[in-house]
Amino acid sequence: GRAENFLRL
């Protein structure tokens, strides 16, 4: 999800 994608930054 979006939250996970953000954490991968």
UniProtKB/Swiss-Prot annotation:
The modified positions for Leucine amide read: 9
Q: Does the keyword Electron transport apply?
A: no
Please give the superkingdom of this protein's source.
Eukaryota
What family classification does the UniProt entry report for this protein?
A: Belongs to the FARP (FMRF amide related peptide) family.
Main localization category: secreted
What functional role does this protein have? FMRFamides and FMRFamide-like peptides are neuropeptides.
Where found, per UniProt?
Secreted
GO biological process terms on file: neuropeptide signaling pathway
Q: What is this protein called?
A: Extended FMRFamide-6
Which is one Gene Ontology cellular component term of this protein? extracellular region
What UniProt keywords are attached to this protein's entry?
Answer: Amidation, Neuropeptide, Secreted
Answer yes or no on keyword S-adenosyl-L-methionine.
no
